[in-house]
Amino acid sequence: MKYILSIDQGTTSSRAIIFDRNANIKGFAQKDFKQIYPHPSWVEHNPNEIWSSLLEIISEALANARTHPNEIATIGITNQRETTIIWDRYTGQPIYNAIVWQDRRTAKICDELKTQGKDKIFLEKTGLVLDPYFSGTKIKWILDNVSQARERAEKGELCFGTIDTWIIWNLTKGKIHITDYSNASRTLLLNINSLNWDDDLLQILNIPKSILPELKQSSEIYGKIDSSIMGTEINISGIAGDQFAATFGQSCLQKGMAKNTYGTGCFTTVNIGHKPIINEQKILTSIAWVKKNITTYVFEGSIFIGGAVIQWLRDNLELFKKSSDAEILAASVNNNGGIYFVPAFVGLGTPHWDPYARGTIIGLTRSSTKEHITRAALESIAFQSFDVLTEMKNSIKGFDIKELRVDGKASQNNLLMQFQADILQCNVVRPKITETTALGAAYLAGLAIGYWENTEEITSLWKSDKIFEPLMKQSQREDLIYNWHKAINRAKSWIE
């Protein structure tokens, strides 16, 4: 069989990409879906709309590749992480909308748990901080607030899943209820040392174990899709949360290698090898993948608003019509005009972990223009990534980043990538294939069935497209960073 189908279910769109053995894209399709904002800081998706979008793009990608389902060797799945769905085990219907990773409604639950001193337990067992970002408190909220949900969960009538679980449930017509360790490591429920759902954590959050999916490796044959989906049965053999799939797709397979994904949010991962290292409260430790019974761990810095700040300028302020116009506007001025934009629309992630921070544009004068604001918005993405990598340097003994591999839509923005290199004072390397999230899922799926022989083969497929080298004077860089930190401190703890 010729190809691998990779399903990349993201925060704002679903994508299907068909790869060949040389990692060339043979077919592509993408479909946006609705973002639901019931209240300030609440973010939801319609799970059925996500599923219907996948059916559309699978068909479209096959048509674009001019291929038939019989030529698909296997399917790999990657997904927005932490986003939480609970559905009826018998009807397959969700009992509530998907609560998205950006959603902050459970901040008070996290505060109460911290007051009880539970944050240390969660950190030691899961490598995560107590934050609304993760699935555990979202599950608790649904069970506590949706009519009869807790009662039905305790009777075994409900299933929980992150998006990967929901996709596979639907692809197999409810026959398979699984997740992989990488997605599970973002729930606040998985012990990343023992690789088991943790009974103590389930008890703290009052979540019945019966709703949880079975744990699987990131690269193994899980089963086949139902023949009604594509007209034939096809193996599913790869799963990884989006940032971990991107890490694999970037061939960051050796300890110390780092990548940054510039998507809706911005996510930096550093491969830390095969033993978990728990950081004191600021940098997350997660499972990147489990393959052939070997676990690879990463440090991660999570920035909630990355490329989404450009979407906000486009849709909410209507400063431009296309996201690609942002680079043109920003490049038309020599600097940010003294403006600093802290896009804390849903709080701040790594290293601040402040759910009560809010967005701030500071330094405005009568001479400020939309060009300056747009440039400040782009620069905010690089500044936030700088803060994450600085914290990582402080956390990993002997770690000094020499090269940052980048991907995601915003990595195509040359102005942003050059500014990132300048602020970090290291090379920023963009690969020829920037669809690394989908590619990572394809690699994991392909390795499970022998489509690719080993990781050495896939590493040989990685090629650099452009290297951005630091050019900025040190004094200018230091001034920018100093003012950025002044601005971010103004944004913190805004909501009381």
From Swiss-Prot:
<dbReference type="GO" id="GO:0019563">
    <property type="term" value="P:glycerol catabolic process"/>
</dbReference>
<dbReference type="Pfam" id="PF02782">
    <property type="entry name" value="FGGY_C"/>
</dbReference>
<feature type="binding site">
    <location>
        <position position="242"/>
    </location>
    <ligand>
        <name>sn-glycerol 3-phosphate</name>
    </ligand>
</feature>
<comment type="similarity">
    <text>Belongs to the FGGY kinase family.</text>
</comment>
<feature type="binding site">
    <location>
        <position position="15"/>
    </location>
    <ligand>
        <name>ADP</name>
    </ligand>
</feature>
<dbReference type="InterPro" id="IPR043129">
    <property type="entry name" value="ATPase_NBD"/>
</dbReference>
<dbReference type="GO" id="GO:0004370">
    <property type="term" value="F:glycerol kinase activity"/>
</dbReference>
<dbReference type="InterPro" id="IPR018483">
    <property type="entry name" value="Carb_kinase_FGGY_CS"/>
</dbReference>
<feature type="binding site">
    <location>
        <position position="311"/>
    </location>
    <ligand>
        <name>ATP</name>
    </ligand>
</feature>
<feature type="binding site">
    <location>
        <position position="81"/>
    </location>
    <ligand>
        <name>glycerol</name>
    </ligand>
</feature>
<feature type="binding site">
    <location>
        <position position="82"/>
    </location>
    <ligand>
        <name>glycerol</name>
    </ligand>
</feature>
<feature type="binding site">
    <location>
        <position position="242"/>
    </location>
    <ligand>
        <name>glycerol</name>
    </ligand>
</feature>
<keyword id="KW-0319">Glycerol metabolism</keyword>
<feature type="binding site">
    <location>
        <position position="133"/>
    </location>
    <ligand>
        <name>glycerol</name>
    </ligand>
</feature>
<dbReference type="GO" id="GO:0006072">
    <property type="term" value="P:glycerol-3-phosphate metabolic process"/>
</dbReference>
<feature type="binding site">
    <location>
        <position position="264"/>
    </location>
    <ligand>
        <name>ADP</name>
    </ligand>
</feature>
<feature type="binding site">
    <location>
        <position position="264"/>
    </location>
    <ligand>
        <name>ATP</name>
    </ligand>
</feature>
<dbReference type="InterPro" id="IPR018485">
    <property type="entry name" value="FGGY_C"/>
</dbReference>
<feature type="binding site">
    <location>
        <position position="11"/>
    </location>
    <ligand>
        <name>ATP</name>
    </ligand>
</feature>
<comment type="pathway">
    <text>Polyol metabolism; glycerol degradation via glycerol kinase pathway; sn-glycerol 3-phosphate from glycerol: step 1/1.</text>
</comment>
<feature type="binding site">
    <location>
        <position position="11"/>
    </location>
    <ligand>
        <name>ADP</name>
    </ligand>
</feature>
<feature type="binding site">
    <location>
        <position position="13"/>
    </location>
    <ligand>
        <name>ATP</name>
    </ligand>
</feature>
<dbReference type="GO" id="GO:0005829">
    <property type="term" value="C:cytosol"/>
</dbReference>
<comment type="function">
    <text>Key enzyme in the regulation of glycerol uptake and metabolism. Catalyzes the phosphorylation of glycerol to yield sn-glycerol 3-phosphate.</text>
</comment>
<dbReference type="InterPro" id="IPR018484">
    <property type="entry name" value="FGGY_N"/>
</dbReference>
<dbReference type="InterPro" id="IPR005999">
    <property type="entry name" value="Glycerol_kin"/>
</dbReference>
<feature type="binding site">
    <location>
        <position position="307"/>
    </location>
    <ligand>
        <name>ADP</name>
    </ligand>
</feature>
<feature type="binding site">
    <location>
        <position position="12"/>
    </location>
    <ligand>
        <name>ATP</name>
    </ligand>
</feature>
<keyword id="KW-0547">Nucleotide-binding</keyword>
<dbReference type="GO" id="GO:0005524">
    <property type="term" value="F:ATP binding"/>
</dbReference>
<keyword id="KW-0418">Kinase</keyword>
<dbReference type="InterPro" id="IPR000577">
    <property type="entry name" value="Carb_kinase_FGGY"/>
</dbReference>
<feature type="binding site">
    <location>
        <position position="81"/>
    </location>
    <ligand>
        <name>sn-glycerol 3-phosphate</name>
    </ligand>
</feature>
<keyword id="KW-0067">ATP-binding</keyword>
<feature type="binding site">
    <location>
        <position position="243"/>
    </location>
    <ligand>
        <name>glycerol</name>
    </ligand>
</feature>
<dbReference type="GO" id="GO:0006071">
    <property type="term" value="P:glycerol metabolic process"/>
</dbReference>
<protein>
    <recommendedName>
        <fullName>Glycerol kinase</fullName>
        <ecNumber>2.7.1.30</ecNumber>
    </recommendedName>
</protein>
<keyword id="KW-0808">Transferase</keyword>
<dbReference type="Pfam" id="PF00370">
    <property type="entry name" value="FGGY_N"/>
</dbReference>
<feature type="binding site">
    <location>
        <position position="11"/>
    </location>
    <ligand>
        <name>sn-glycerol 3-phosphate</name>
    </ligand>
</feature>
<feature type="binding site">
    <location>
        <position position="133"/>
    </location>
    <ligand>
        <name>sn-glycerol 3-phosphate</name>
    </ligand>
</feature>
<feature type="binding site">
    <location>
        <position position="413"/>
    </location>
    <ligand>
        <name>ADP</name>
    </ligand>
</feature>
